[in-house]
Design a protein with these regions (language model features):
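Ordered alpha/beta subdomains of enzyme catalytic regions
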Residues: 2, 64-299, 326-327, 333, ...
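Long, intrinsically disordered low-complexity tandem-repeat segments
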Residues: 9-46
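Ala/Thr-enriched low-complexity intrinsically disordered regions
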Residues: 52, 56-59, 68
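Glycine-rich beta-to-alpha transition loops that act as phosphate-gripper elements at the mouths
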Residues: 235-237, 365-373, 392-394
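Glycine- and Gly-Pro-enriched alpha-helical subdomains that act as flexible
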Residues: 274-365
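Catalytic cores of alpha/beta
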Residues: 371-385
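Glycine-rich phosphate-binding active-site loops on the catalytic face of alpha/beta enzymes
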Residues: 385-403
Length: 569
């Protein structure tokens, strides 16, 4: 890694004009090598899909050997140096740590969120693959250091340290596509304090965005009740990255395809689309436009029927083309119409009747036009004859809740004896008080139904067994308790290692396999938790030991405040 970093610096100083291409030797993985190297991952076992880590080797491979299972051009989008994708105060704090005695202290940071977006009962984990790529490429190039030097706030000693910087810690995360809940650590970073501090902003940027869009997609797909949902939002997204990674997250959340061709190539996911009004308008008349399209794309013949008049012109002309195809022996596997304006419930029912009477009961009726989960649910309730939904703006921008709200907080710091000392953040708002210590998560399933009963956060040294009675209690109202006896429940640890001692030890599944895993995860939710309005909230409980640790810290800090107040008085 040091050799690669020096090569990068030398090339930058020589004025290499091909700055858009990644230059380090370790980054020149060809697509052929990637495909050959991932053959064992192409047949993803169930444990691979849920993110079970590979067996930890005695000597971890170099970061350049860590692989993902995305499309062949993944390097060009993910393999870029995003080290300066951070807030300035992360770097100023790093320099502060560097010049203080605890510069080498190992700490634990947790990334978590406080409330489900959209008023929902659950969220979906997204962005883990991009988090891995970010950490792998983490280093300060010569141009980065020159820029930081130009700010006039960083000393030469600190900049020299950054020149040789690389990540050496451990990172754990909930597997991508998992159902997640508030206040539990989605990502846990165990690393020297300067390293753990630096990665805060990028981790939140990556995880917040894709988790938000995956969650929105899951809600939209739930409203569609088994109909196919297509992600159509690229042109309305906040830039290329948001459009492309957002489409990736939408697929994970349940969408069957995206209109984003770059996303399709990068992540090997299905792409789909029909045609625009401009296609129809460019021909002398609507029928000629439809016929020309059907001649070129007989197996993907979805005709947009609302350019002029949906029921008087569009649907009749589409039927005429379908009849001619049938007469000429053209068997289309995928044909129908798309509605993009007007009263979608009324128009779809009228169009369905016209198509059925013409002998085309298998014709698809697709709809778009500012759809979201609430409108789809309403259209379903009205009996709309729509079986395919194109969802754009409201999905790709998460329009009604455009931020996920994830945070990154210090939870523990290692003492001289090697033990982690728990740390807690107080707040005037009870929900903002953090859970201290080095922690892990158990998911508790009701064995009879395999539905999620609760999530249990405990200290890392604790273990729980399905062979012993499990006591669950609400940390906000601890008198509310539930006992689960052996045979009534199953346990699963959620956090899996991504990096150990700075080396990647995890292979991310392909996006479509993550999607399949996510669909299974959603099946583990109670119907009352999945409903869109006023859902049942799954309990996120604390172990007795973690709860007592938290209360003791709160009490001790309250006593310190009281003593200080007495001194002032």
């Amino acid at each position: 890694m040091d050799k690669e970093r020096k090569n990068d610096s030398k090339e930058r100083e020589e004025g290499c004009k091909q700055s858009s291409k990644v230059r380090e030797e370790g980054y020149k993985q060809s697509s052929k090598e990637r495909e050959e190297g991932c053959k064992q991952s192409s047949k993803v076992r169930e444990e691979d899909v849920i993110g079970t880590p590979k067996e930890t080797p005695k000597a971890f491979p170099k970061q350049g050997k860590c692989r993902t299972n995305s499309g062949r051009k993944q390097d060009e989008m993910d393999r870029q140096n995003l080290t300066l994708l951070t807030d300035l105060y992360e770097l100023t704090m790093m320099q502060g740590y560097y010049r203080n005695a605890h510069r080498n202290a190992t700490v634990v940071f947790d990334a978590f969120f406080r409330n489900n977006p959209f008023g929902g009962g659950y969220s979906i984990m997204g962005g883990v693959e991009q988090l891995i790529e970010y950490i792998r490429e983490l280093h300060f190039g010569a141009e980065d250091i020159r820029y930081l030097s130009s700010l006039g706030i960083f000393g030469k000693d600190f900049l020299d340290y950054l020149h040789d910087f690389h990540f050496t810690g451990d990172i754990y995360a909930v597997p991508e596509g998992s159902v997640i809940f508030p206040r539990e650590p989605l990502v846990k970073v165990v690393a020297p304090i300067m390293e753990a501090q630096l990665v805060e902003t990028a981790i939140l940027n990556i995880i917040n965005h894709q988790s938000l869009i995956a969650t929105k997609a899951a809600r939209v797909c739930y409203a569609a009740k088994g109909d196919g949902v297509l992600e159509f939002g690229l042109r309305r997204a906040q830039g290329p990255d948001a459009g492309t990674y957002g489409a990736r997250a939408a697929i994970i959340g349940g969408c069957v395809a995206t209109s984003n061709v770059l996303c399709g190539e990068l992540f090997d996911v299905p792409v789909a689309g029909t045609h625009a009004h401009s296609w129809v308008m460019s021909f002398p008349d609507e029928y000629t436009a439809f016929k020309a399209y059907a001649d070129i794309y007989p197996d993907a013949c979805i005709l947009l029927v609302d350019t002029y008049d949906t029921l008087e012109s569009g649907v009749p002309n589409a039927i005429r083309v379908f009849q001619e195809m049938k007469k000429n022996g053209v068997k289309s596997r995928h044909f129908g119409i798309r509605l993009d304006s007007g009263d979608l419930a009324y128009l779809s029912k009228k169009a369905r009747k016209m198509l059925d009477e013409a002998g085309f009961p298998d014709a698809i009726i697709s709809a778009s036009n500012d759809l979201d989960e609430n409108l789809i649910l309403s259209l379903k309730a009205q009996g709309a004859a729509i079986t395919s939904w194109g969802v754009g703006t409201h999905l790709i921008t998460a329009k009604d809740n455009p931020s996920f709200g994830g945070v990154y907080k210090l939870a523990a710091i290692q003492g001289q004896d090697g033990k982690f000392l728990p740390k807690i953040k107080l707040s005037e708002n009870t929900e903002k008080i953090t859970n201290p210590g080095d922690k892990k998560i158990y998911r508790v399933y009701e064995k009879a139904t395999h539905k999620i009963k609760a999530d249990l956060i405990c200290l890392n040294e604790e273990t729980f067994s399905e062979d012993k009675t499990l006591l669950l209690f609400d940390p906000q109202e601890p008198w509310k308790k539930t006992k689960m006896h052996p045979g009534e429940f199953e346990l699963r640890e959620l956090l899996v290692p991504l990096f150990q001692k700075g080396a990647c030890c995890y292979t991310s599944p392909r996006v479509m396999d993550i999607r399949a895993y996510c669909n299974k995860e959603k099946e583990s939710l109670w119907e009352e938790t999945r409903r869109l309005v006023n859902p049942h909230q799954i309990y996120v409980d604390l172990s007795k030991k973690l709860y007592d640790t938290k209360i003791d810290l709160l009490s001790s800090l309250s006593q310190v405040d009281a003593d200080a107040e007495n001194i002032e008085n």
